[in-house]
Amino acid sequence: MGLSNVQLWTILLWALAWVQSTRSACPSCGAPTLTPQGERALVLELAKQQILEGLHLTSRPRITRPLPQAALTRALRRLQPRSMVPGNREKVISFATSIDKSTSTYRSVLTFQLSPLWSHHLYHARLWLHVPPSFPATLYLRIFGCGTTRCRGSRTFLAEHQTTSSGWHALTLPSSGLRSEESGVTKLQLEFRPLDLNSTTARLPRLLLDTAGQQRPFLELKIRANEPGAGRARRRTPTCESETPLCCRRDHYVDFQELGWRDWILQPEGYQLNYCSGQCPPHLAGSPGIAASFHSAVFSLLKANNPWPAGSSCCVPTARRPLSLLYLDHNGNVVKTDVPDMVVEACGCS
């Protein structure tokens, strides 16, 4: 679910007020902290605007007469460039092997057996859960990553979701929160409660999830092999971790299905909407950088509304690459285009 214009501008104005109160020398050096779901909603809204701007569209095409499947397949075969066929990319489906319900009546721990991905980069993760018809129509779900064997110690909030119907539901998880133990075991904790005022937890069935039947929870993971030299690139521009204060690249994978745009964007399935953030100490100032583009629209807006000291060093993109898209235009034509400078690959201090 995306943000409305009012919600988006509310977040931007709140961020502006935060920066003005702190008088930071650079808008990308320390942004106000958003909740994971708030940051995700903002990223999805920015992705919509970035795609529309890159395609010079004011609104998404409305597909009233879908192309016949045979004609669409033939067009895709002719137009799809080799570069759009992801090389060394894999999709992994991992089913929960056990569910521990001993921690609480309405709290469950899901265990997944994942092989350590030392030679691969995890760039997209979704948790699929099945809500049975015996539960209220509206449930509030929260997912946590566990830091200990039975989730009794520290845990990290990953996602929240509100159901409005029974059946399958997909929760997008931050890939950084799915760190497995050396044994490959990953544990996620699920909490749930009803949002219907006429429902009470006392009347809720205890078993929300089941690993024995046809509705087993599962993780959908998208990974790609690390390219030669990727380690050196990561040392120059590390991917942002929660404890990283310095200039780094913050990675977000946007699935067009999550945007509700798979009816008109044919290829690829999604793309990396990355941006740069972090501090630039004096000894890092002057590293090669290029002007930020729409990907850092938040920072650009803040900077335009606040006079920053001359000579201040900011964390900005230093390398970007185009994004190849196959899409249906307003007339139902299949169009192939390369949108320049869409994906940030490296960051540095200006």
UniProtKB/Swiss-Prot annotation:
Glycosylation-annotated residues: 198
GO molecular function list: cytokine activity; growth factor activity; hormone activity
Gene Ontology BP annotations: negative regulation of adipose tissue development
Chief place of localization: secreted
Signal peptide (from-to): 1-21
InterPro entries from the UniProt entry: Cystine-knot_cytokine (IPR029034), Inhibin_betaC (IPR001318), TGF-b_C (IPR001839), TGF-beta-rel (IPR015615), TGFb_CS (IPR017948)
Function noted in UniProt: Inhibins and activins inhibit and activate, respectively, the secretion of follitropin by the pituitary gland. Inhibins/activins are involved in regulating a number of diverse functions such as hypothalamic and pituitary hormone secretion, gonadal hormone secretion, germ cell development and maturation, erythroid differentiation, insulin secretion, nerve cell survival, embryonic axial development or bone growth, depending on their subunit composition. Inhibins appear to oppose the functions of activins.
Assembly notes: Homodimeric or heterodimeric through association with alpha and beta subunits, linked by one or more disulfide bonds. Inhibins are heterodimers of one alpha and one beta subunit. Activins are homo- or heterodimers of beta subunits only.
Family: Belongs to the TGF-beta family.
UniProt protein name: Inhibin beta E chain
Organism placement in taxonomy: Eukaryota, Metazoa, Chordata, Craniata, Vertebrata
Gene: Inhbe
